[in-house]
């Protein structure tokens, strides 16, 4: 494909309100962005791709009982970027993949099922001798509902199938690098030798810019799955439930545990050293029922998943909670907040907290996890869940009565936390003036009695700490004080429609006429109230998800 992009843009002036007003009470404004005239930029992108694919498929039923299937395929792909930098030799080299795959299936009376798949995939991203990887997969199923004793004892069961599978999948996209087994050598990055008494004579030299990884191989994901499929009461109830486990071995990542004697302190090599596992449950269920002229359909689905780090070449640490091994991928980490300091006496009696400013009453108090009397990075611990939801679910309802139709969809997440921060929650942290979150300033904040006139505002359990101007290293640190649940349940979609009778529409040569109303993102239930918890930045500066209302008229002739 080829893509030509022409951008024309100009910037208008941006002014910022200052801290003080003039003698007449008017805001003092300062220009922070100058106006720029219209300018034009052109960008060209594109690539060339070649595909070749050939396959052979064979299926046959023997003796009315043995169903056999055989499939084979060869696939080749080449992709060349056409807009690489003229000096980029690697960028000019095509990306090539070659794969052979096959499948064998067998079923006996559609009761006992077996399948074997294999793939032999080659990638030019690996050195000679390691370019191809073999990735097998096998699965088996037992449709127990096809047994005569089940049909006799439990006739209300339409289908009940037990299944299990195991397979391996390879990945050759390693950190986005081309030919990562090759070391890149050049004369850039200050590579030189110094000569002379004071080292003033410097001679250009070659330098390893990127260290290659010998014996690099495919990342391998081993996937396990056990599940059931079911259908009861002539299809009124149906669904599936699965338990899954994905174990990823030989993950391509940077080595972190290498002695300084190797001379690689500032550039440790990449290697197949990482291991992770993801496991969880997923399922869906549907219910269909007719009550008189009303037809109902209820459906629900969920996915629950956890991803743990098994190994990432870390150095041993006596503070076990400082390691990534054994914790979730992208685990949230921070200090444990113990409320707010009540007075100076409490500050003096507590473990020492360091900051870019003196610790004052109303500042956040932290737990000394390792007991050394000082609050520092050694007291940062894993906290809560990660930002990516561990639980996702949805519930839908459909109903129709005569010519009326109703559809409702709920969607939600759980098992996820996030830190709030930035210029919104930490008001005035950048020594700037402008929009701030009103809830952060006017809410339940710790306020000195000298300002409020009452000791009631010196509350160690207040929602917000002492308000300060400029950055506050103590209060702005990630901690349980700023950690919130990100779970929510949203009424994602509601649709109501009416189908006009065809006996009436045909008079106007219309076969179908539907009038409908659609509402999206109408309601949200969440413990976090300050802004929309779905997909927002830590400071809430994302544009919120809109509620939308629309009507439509659908006509078919």
Show the residue positions of the predicted features.
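Extracytoplasmic gating/loop element in the C-terminal half of outer-membrane beta-barrel translocons
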Residues: 22, 413-509, 513-514
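Extracellular/periplasmic, surface-exposed regions of secreted and cell-surface proteins
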Residues: 1-10, 28-330, 474, 478-557
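Charged, glycine/proline-rich intrinsically disordered loops and linkers
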Residues: 18-31, 358
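Conserved small-residue
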Residues: 178, 183, 187, 192, ...
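Glycine-rich, aromatic-lined ligand/substrate-binding cores of catalytic
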Residues: 386-421
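Glycine-rich, charged/polar anion/phosphate-binding loops
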Residues: 210-212, 379-383, 390-395
């Amino acid at each position: 494909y080829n893509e030509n992009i022409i951008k024309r843009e100009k910037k208008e002036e941006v002014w910022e309100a200052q801290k003080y007003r003039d003698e007449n009470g008017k805001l003092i404004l300062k220009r922070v962005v100058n106006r720029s005239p219209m300018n034009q930029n052109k960008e060209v992108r594109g690539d060339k791709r070649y595909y070749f694919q050939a396959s052979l498929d064979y299926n046959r039923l023997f003796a009315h009982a043995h169903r056999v299937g055989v499939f084979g395929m060869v696939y080749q792909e080449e992709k060349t970027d056409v807009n690489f930098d003229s000096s980029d030799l690697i960028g000019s080299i095509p990306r090539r993949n070659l794969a052979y795959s096959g499948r064998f299936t067998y079923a006996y009376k559609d009761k006992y099922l077996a399948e074997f798949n294999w793939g032999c995939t080659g990638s030019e991203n690996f050195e000679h001798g390691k370019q191809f990887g073999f990735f097998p997969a096998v699965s088996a199923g037992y449709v127990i509902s096809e047994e005569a004793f089940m049909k006799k004892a439990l006739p209300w069961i339409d289908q009940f199938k037990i299944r299990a599978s195991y397979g391996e999948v390879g990945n050759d996209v390693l950190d986005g690098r081309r030919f990562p087994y090759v070391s890149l050598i050049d004369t850039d990055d200050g590579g030189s030798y110094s000569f002379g008494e004071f080292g003033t004579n410097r001679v250009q030299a070659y330098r390893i810019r990127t260290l290659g990884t010998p014996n690099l191989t495919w990342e391998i994901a081993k996937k396990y799955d056990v599940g059931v499929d079911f259908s009861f009461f002539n299809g009124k109830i149906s669904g599936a439930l699965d338990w899954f486990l994905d174990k990823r071995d030989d993950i391509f990542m940077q080595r972190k545990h290498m002695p300084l004697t190797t001379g690689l302190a500032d550039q440790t090599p990449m290697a197949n050293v990482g291991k992770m596992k993801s496991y969880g449950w997923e399922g869906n269920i549907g219910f269909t029922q007719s009550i008189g002229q009303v037809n109902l359909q209820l459906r629900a689905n969920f996915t629950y998943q956890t991803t743990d780090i098994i190994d990432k070449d870390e150095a041993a640490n006596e503070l076990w909670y400082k390691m990534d091994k054994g914790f979730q991928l992208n685990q949230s980490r921070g200090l444990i907040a113990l409320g707010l300091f009540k007075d100076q006496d409490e500050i003096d009696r507590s473990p020492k907290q360091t900051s870019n400013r003196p610790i004052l009453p109303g500042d956040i108090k932290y737990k000394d996890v390792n007991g050394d009397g000082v609050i520092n990075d050694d007291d940062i611990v894993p906290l809560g869940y990660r930002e990516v939801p561990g639980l996702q679910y949805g519930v839908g309802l459909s109903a129709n009565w005569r010519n009326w139709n109703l559809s409702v969809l709920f969607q939600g997440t759980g098992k996820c936390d996030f830190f709030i921060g930035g210029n919104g929650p930490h008001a005035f942290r950048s020594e700037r003036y402008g929009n701030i979150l009103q809830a952060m300033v006017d809410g339940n904040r710790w306020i000195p009695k000298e300002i409020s006139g009452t000791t009631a505002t010196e509350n160690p359990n207040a929602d917000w700490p002492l308000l300060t101007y400029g950055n506050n290293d103590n209060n702005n640190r990630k901690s349980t004080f700023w950690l919130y649940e990100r779970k929510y349940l949203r009424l994602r979609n509601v649709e109501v429609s009416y189908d006009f009778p065809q006996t009436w529409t045909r008079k106007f040569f219309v076969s179908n006429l539907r009038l409908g109303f659609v509402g999206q993102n109408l309601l949200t239930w969440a413990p976090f109230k300050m802004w929309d918890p779905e997909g927002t930045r830590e400071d809430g500066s994302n544009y919120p998800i809109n509620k939308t209302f629309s009507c439509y008229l659908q006509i078919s002739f």
